[in-house]
Swiss-Prot record:
Skewed-composition ranges (Low complexity): 1304-1326
EC number(s) on file: 3.6.4.-
Pfam families to which the protein is assigned, alphabetical: BRK, Bromodomain, Helicase_C, HSA, QLQ, SNF2-rel_dom
Species annotation: Caenorhabditis elegans
Protein name: SWI/SNF chromatin remodeling complex core catalytic subunit swsn-4
Main location: nucleus
Gene knockout outcome: RNAi knockdown results in 100% embryonic lethality. When RNAi is restricted to mesodermal cells of the MS, C and D lineages, which include the somatic gonadal precursor cells, results in gonadogenesis defects with increased expression of the head mesodermal cell marker arg-1 in somatic gonadal precursor cells.
Annotated PROSITE patterns: BROMODOMAIN_1, BROMODOMAIN_2, HELICASE_ATP_BIND_1, HELICASE_CTER, HSA, QLQ
Amino acid sequence: MSGRPAFEQFTAQPPQPAGEVVAQQAGDGAQGQELTISKLENAITSMEEQGLQNDHRHAKAVLLKQKLQSGLPDAVPGQENGGNQQITPAQLNQLRAQVSAYRLLARNEQVPANLIADAVMLRPKVTTLLPEPYEYPGEAENGEKLPYDLMKIFNLHQIRCNRPTTISVPSGIDPVGMLKQRENMIQNRIGLRMKLLNNLPADIPDHMKLKAEIELRALRLVNLQTQVRSEVMACLKRDTTLETALNPYAYRRTKRQSLREARVTEKLEKQQKMEQERKRRQKHTDLMQAIIQHGKEFKEYHRNNLLKMAKSRKAVMTYHQNNERERKKDEIRNEKLRMQKLMQEDEEGYRALLDEKKDQRLVYLLQQTDEYVDSLCSLVRQHQNTEKKKKKEDKKIEKGNQMDEEARVHVRERSTGKALTGDQAPKTEEIEFWLETHPEYEIVPRDQLSDDEEEEEEEAPVEPEEEKDDQYAGMDEETKAKMILEKARNEEDEYDQKTKKQMADYYATAHKIKEKVVKQHTTMGGGDPNLLLKPYQIKGLEWMVSLYNNNLNGILADEMGLGKTIQTISLVTYLMEVKQNNGPYLVIVPLSTLSNWQNEFAKWAPSVTTIIYKGTKDARRRVEGQIRKGAFNVLMTTYEYVIKEKALLGKIRWKYMIIDEGHRLKNHNCKLTLMLNGFFHAQHRLLLTGTPLQNKLPELWALLNFLLPSIFSSCGTFEQWFNAPFATTGEKVELNQEETMLIIRRLHKVLRPFLLRRLKKEVESQLPDKTEYVIKCDQSALQKVIYRHMQKGLLLDAKMSSGARSLMNTVVHLRKLCNHPFLFPNIEDSCRAYWKVNEVNGTDLMRVAGKLELLDRILPKLKATGHRILMFFQMTSMMNIFEDFLNFRRYTYLRLDGSTKPDERGDLLTQFNAPNSDLFLFMLSTRAGGLGLNLQTADTVIIFDSDWNPHQDMQAQDRAHRIGQKKEVRVLRLITANSVEEKILAAARYKLNVDEKVIQAGKFDQRSTGAERKQMLEQIIQADGEEEEEEEVPDDETVNQMVARSEEEFNIFQSMDIDRRREEANQLHRKPRLLEEHEIPDDILKLSFDYEEMERAREEGREVVDQTPNQRRRRREVDYSSDLLSDEQFMKQVEEVEDENNQAVAERKKQRKRKMAGLDENDDSMDDVVLQHKKKKTDPELAEKINEMLDVILEYKNEDGELIADVFQTLPTRKELPDYYQVISKPMDFDRINKKIETGRYTVMEELNDDMNLLVNNAQTYNEEGSEIYVSSETIGKLWKEQYDKFMNPPKPVEEPVKKKEPSTPSTSSSRPSTSGTPSVSDLQRTQQATAQQMLMLMTHMQSLPPAQAQQFQQALMTQTGGNQALMLQYMQSAMLAQRAQASTKVTPKKDEKKETSSSVKTEEAKKDDEPSTSSASAPPPKKKKESEDSEDPMEEDEEEEIIGQKKEPASSRRKSRPTRRFSNEDEEEEDDE
């Protein structure tokens, strides 16, 4: 009772119809009966209006009405006077209790249980109209008492007969009773469940305890939920009963309304409506006012919030700005303090300040390494425990079940990490399509998935973390940093006995279980006493067995040629013999080395059952049965078949997966790595590689991640950690040798347990040495011409309409050109057509390429002394050309590249390695023939072109330098001088440098002491700062020294060179060994000249029509205002210039050579051909004067007695100071200046002045103002200016009036007056730009005209210069130089003086445009010059016609004279600067 809501308890019994109550009140007369019938009719009508016809109360009301109308008795027989009975006290108490309960329910209050018991008197439901048995007994004839008297209950049967429905509604099942029974059952079950949950055992898992506690609390809240629901339902159902829903006034007697009452009612109604309307309007007004007020408050609130936020933001910004300002002040103060210490030569103080800046970074790095090593220790322990459990599980799985099981690939959702396994995972053959349709999933390695499942099943007990910083507690930051650094400097080696006794370090944690391997086991070697493992190979076997025992995977990274294959075979046989582990073992090798592995297994382990899984589909199908049965020990296959046959091979649970040339897995996302991780399950993995570190450190991480994904899981952490000492951080304060060594020693701890690497020079002492030489080759003239344009991205092609083709990958084409120009078919076609031959072969094929020319000198010497050669190429097309060369020289050779079939490779190796083989040379491609080949019968390796990856070249070298080699190995690397190949070589050396620091300096041979590793690391770091000087192309003697192995061979090679030169000298038509420029096809030369002219035209602003990229050169300018002379100085300079011209003409007549016609830069038409003279050497007097001027600067000392020029003598290298070469585009130092003086590059003093100004400007640009170098550069600039002014303006006694005239000379061509009355530099330059061309023409004609006409020209010259003596001197000097050039250049016949004068003038103009200058003024556009020439000098037209006529000279005449073309002056200077 108490568990049910109050309203349900009251409504549990069906309510009595209202008609029954009325009938009881009206039982004493017909008048009361009529009234009762009328009320019943009203009730029935009201219920019908409300649609309650189906209600049981409606049916009972109708039945009662019928009874009253038919006059049937309404009382049970024997109770006729029941209507007059008085109410009993029990009924009165029940009525009062009902009234009280109704009042409580109306107020929605709780009804007490005793009140409910008094108000509801349950009585059994009457299911029949019959009285109780023996209530009206009857008597039978024999005196027997019967239960009923039939006459007394006749009326009851009569009522049943008069019912309107003959079939009564069956009573059925009492729903109230069933509901009570159901509730009792539920309550019992709830009680039992709560009792069970209270008595749960204490050892259940935590997640089960949590679920039980949640369920128990929910069950306890059932009663509260029921009570709340009952209260809510009471509010909802209060107005839904019949008594409250019907209109109570319907039961009143209708009163007739009078007219007065109607009027009063209408009036009251109107008043009520008006009041309601007023209230509605007032309510709406109040609502609007509240909304408006709320809006105002809302806006005000948020406005205040914004103001508060703005104030807070401003306060925070002010705080950080103040902090930043203070920090910058501190930095500036410290910087000034360091500079002050440096200026005061306080080295100790400067070093202390510098260390203070670097210690923070170093301490951070050391702390990071400690944390990383500690985390790896825990990961290694966890990995070992997991692997132990996996081994136990693998033993329970039968092989047959695994083979029959349908292979499925485990995948994982990237975002959530949820893995799909079992039937939910996709099948092997459907994985590719499934991944395309589900891009959010990725393949997860089976080993890694099993690790995760193991972690979920059982949580390892967490060891309490030890506090690491206890020893530094209570110290300030500075003391703590010093303690960390001191500890790192004094750190003992981890292999020391003291360290082993103190605690288990990182290596001891990994190799906890140790097993000694003393001698070779019996199954290794097949019983042959000659097949014995070397001591270092037994050590390698012991290391691999230790990995097996400790459930780890590793990398056997011995240097190439130390027998990694044999050591791997010894591991397999050891596990089979000692550990009773018969496999299966999966060995994945490159296709080129598969036959070698097969031979080694047959030789060293004949008892091991091996399967070679390769070949066609039928061949592979023949061995599938044996594979499915597991009737083998070792299965050898290649990378391709592993990917192709993953469905078959992935079902086998391999004991060991061995991958040869493991650096194939250096890309973490490559297909091979994904397939091996996703499809294959192996207990142990082993990688074999000779180059564990190739291009980048993440590649080493990829290998470790493939082996141990649970330990090396984050590439970002690994790369960030390792790259600190190597990568450029952008900070000027770099780590010194000691600090770099401290960090690298820490990093070696990570790699040492998983990496074993021994070098041949350490373990194989009887192996002969290997020496590598870089031989620089010269370029032929054809290569130089094409290379110069190819650097701009153009390939000269006469077949193209534009004359050239744009190149996309310029570096690749430059490499091709360095190898051989005939790698471009259009170049070969042009040469073939120009030389009038069907095919270019023989010596011509060698003469066009510098590398072939060098090999033509080297190969005969090696052939004569019995050496055999391996030659490696990057391009197979170059191998085709080299084959033609070998056939021409009749050398026997073999060739192996990517197109060679796998079955043929073994035959080629057998032929070359045969004892009496006459094969001299073996051509191989670096990628196809550089792996796994044994070619130790050769002793010379020639790398024709280098690979970007230096380890590819090292692999190629070790094809000959390996176990079994008896001779000294000589490696020759061919590099084209001043080409892109030098940059490739530099990049390769940098990669090898990283390899040395990380791998080799780690000394992963498991026996080196800490002192040895520290010494080796110091040597490597010290070598970083040493940069080799640029080597020139070696001569024959130098090459012989590189190639010769002994003094005897050197003498033989020298004599062979003498014989070769003698033979070439006796040839009838002797040709130089390299192609010269007059032999280059005319179409290529013409295209080269045209594009050079286009470049000049673009620089000068002329319009050109071409399709070439717009790349402009930097032009040098001429300063015309450098010398302002008086009249006497002017006349003396004119006389000196005339003397110099006469002397130069005499010298040029003796040393005159053939010239080639070139294009004038100042002509509008690119077809105007003029003579271009070769650059002259430095005059001896000028060179002597230059040396005297430089000696003054080089010998100048500062106050401390130090030479200020020492810092500027030699610039630091690009490796030492890379940011300098990013800021300074054109570096300059005194070494470069001295080199130009020695080679005669300075023809005039202005060129040296430009270089000196460049040197000073560079120093002031890069260094800060006030620094020591900056001050020294200012001193050098002042000293040079004094020397230069003395040279240009020698001291002469000058009269005083003359000095006064000089500043008062006006500039007639300047439109802007000078403020001081003296023409400014810009005014003079503007004057020179406007009149330079006209005056040069006039001065040239003055020398060949009669005196009267020459005087007219002189007057015109004075008019144009405005009487400026300096300008007149400048023009006179230019005229003299033009006359000197005219006298030294006599290729065309001298028909008249006008033609010579015009040619000389144009040549002089071209020379003046090429001269360097530091002035900011630039020459006006050529079109303006042309216009001024046409307006001032009408004779220019006749001269131009003669010059244009000269351009029509046919090309055949130029070929007959065979002129020698040279590089332009600017090109030579740019090459020298590079």
